[in-house]
Amino acid sequence: MNEILNTKDINAIGEFFIETWGCQMNEEDSEKLSGMLKKEGYIRTEERENADVIIFNTCCVRENAELKVYGNLGILKGLKSKNPNLIIAVTGCMMQQKGMAETIKKKFPFVDIIIGTHNLHNFPNYLNEVKKKDTSVLKIQEKEDSIIENMPIDRKNSMKAFVTIMYGCNNFCTYCIVPYVRGRERSRTPENIEDEIKKLISEGYKEITLLGQNVNSYGKDLEPKVTFAELLERVNTIDGLERVRFMTSHPKDLTDDVIEAIAKCDKLCEQIHLPVQSGSSEILKKMNRHYDREKYLDVVSKIKKLIPNVALSTDIIVGFPGETEKDFEETLSLVKEVEYDSAFTFLYSIRKGTPAAKFEDQVPEDVKHKRFNRLVEVVNEISAKKNKAYEGKIEEVLVEGTSKNDENKLMGRTRTGKLVNFIGDKDSIGKLVNVKIIKANSFSLTGEEI
């Protein structure tokens, strides 16, 4: 495995600010950037105006994320003119797209560092280069390297942590840019994953979320091969670990042994995120999802049979090219049949460089928005019903801190991922406690510690 390059000669130490768009993988990348900079002696600030180094970690899964980057970069021009020594860096998936780095440099020439997803570990070197030579750096590494282990990481949460088990994606869904910007699938060894988790437990962490673009493909590239189910069983035996979650699962690869592992491993939470994207077999075929409606519902049926109290969540794209009213109605009926606890719903947006961008039968924007609103209404109605079923029950909650809405209350999550605001003892923060659910709200639960 490659080791991170180490530098200790950055001249003046100052403050840095990181803004992150996108998924949990991006969040963990930002934690690594923060870890590297803190190791160099920098201090993190939450105020852009105070920073000596500003880093934007970008996303390109949807157009909206890109527009936010453009808007925020425009704002930085004023900060740069006030403080010429300010160093501005842009990284992440958006920069990994073909020609994007050059576009950013042309539109925003005041940006000092532009790098992609594959050379993030060298960020301190690039920063050093800019400071020493008074130059700019534009380095996009097109091919992914082997996995970099032992990177310093500055985690935002003191009791829950992301642990990446694999990088990249081999699925090539027609709407998705991820395989082009994150590279092919590469799995970490189970030993390295276990070592990271054990270190986190020694630091007081209670809950781990195993991350990958498609965790069910884990281990196929390792020698000897290791299945995701085997990894789950190994992680479940680690002493001191209280809870394990994972995301994201691809329905085509969610095998019976994984479902069985979740059912029998006591530390694995009864929560599965299973993106369906559409309820129409015709649209799923156009998306290149490698399953149809029937296969998806079959997987859901197996999950519910083995894990009766499971909480299911999903991703749904509305307005994919060629989606008819009939296709959309099939999505609505699937949502009603599965009864998701929650769903992340998105309007389809064209991603340049993907096959779907060239599809001619694009759905009009007004139609997309009407369908989206109808879907959200159904999803919210089901979510409220699922939450209502918790009233009167006693749930195990990992207490994360005080409630955002009421500092006199505590907040945490159930094993099924439900957010609970409750009256309790502040000494319980960081612990697992039993909470009686008194009231269900649209997107959270209210309770009291018992």
UniProtKB/Swiss-Prot annotation:
It holds the Pfam family TRAM. One of its GO terms (cellular component) is cytosol. This is tRNA-2-methylthio-N(6)-dimethylallyladenosine synthase. Monomer. Residues 388-450 form the TRAM domain. Catalyzes the methylthiolation of N6-(dimethylallyl)adenosine (i(6)A), leading to the formation of 2-methylthio-N6-(dimethylallyl)adenosine (ms(2)i(6)A) at position 37 in tRNAs that read codons beginning with uridine. Residues 155-385 form the Radical SAM core domain. Residues 14-132 form the MTTase N-terminal domain. The keyword 4Fe-4S applies. It comes from Clostridium botulinum (strain Okra / Type B1). InterPro entries: Elp3/MiaA/NifB-like_rSAM, Methylthiotransferase, Methylthiotransferase_CS, Methylthiotransferase_N, Methylthiotransferase_N_sf, MiaB_methiolase, rSAM, rSAM_horseshoe. Binds 2 [4Fe-4S] clusters. One cluster is coordinated with 3 cysteines and an exchangeable S-adenosyl-L-methionine. [4Fe-4S] cluster 2 binds at residues 169, 173, 176. It is found in: Cytoplasm. Its cofactor is [4Fe-4S] cluster.
